[in-house]
């Protein structure tokens, strides 16, 4: 739908640039959250900083954000810019490479508020838990969960992504 506000997220800047590439191919306008250092030159004009450069008032900045139908970012970049949710809410967030993203990178976004409403209404997680696992440095012993409340929701190892944990909780007997 034309008025649906979509947030496209991924773990790496390269993956976000790939998303931006597909949007450009389809002539879909978007805002990219990030910096010129982390973003391919082809998308510098789409960076939020550059999109609002001509805005002379706070209302003009807010209007630019509110009017943006598609916003792209890494989870880290969005977590660093949560003030965005004071201005804009999203109908849908699509998270690519979700199997690489640990829960702390997503939980803040999933719980974010915009006024009295959820900042993001729905999430779609896309990934392959057998292909791109979360990147962690902790050992199995350091990552083992022992808290009964966390174990009760299937959180047994802090090295597993939310995507993998959710997937395993919905697997059937047949696999």
Regions inferred by a protein language model and the residue ranges of each:
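Conserved helicase motor core of SF1/SF2 NTP-dependent helicases
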Residues: 4, 11-14, 26, 76-78, ...
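Short conserved micro-motifs at the rims of enzyme active sites and ligand-binding pockets
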Residues: 20, 42-45, 83-85, 135-137
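Conserved helicase/translocase P-loop NTPase motor core
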Residues: 57-86, 105
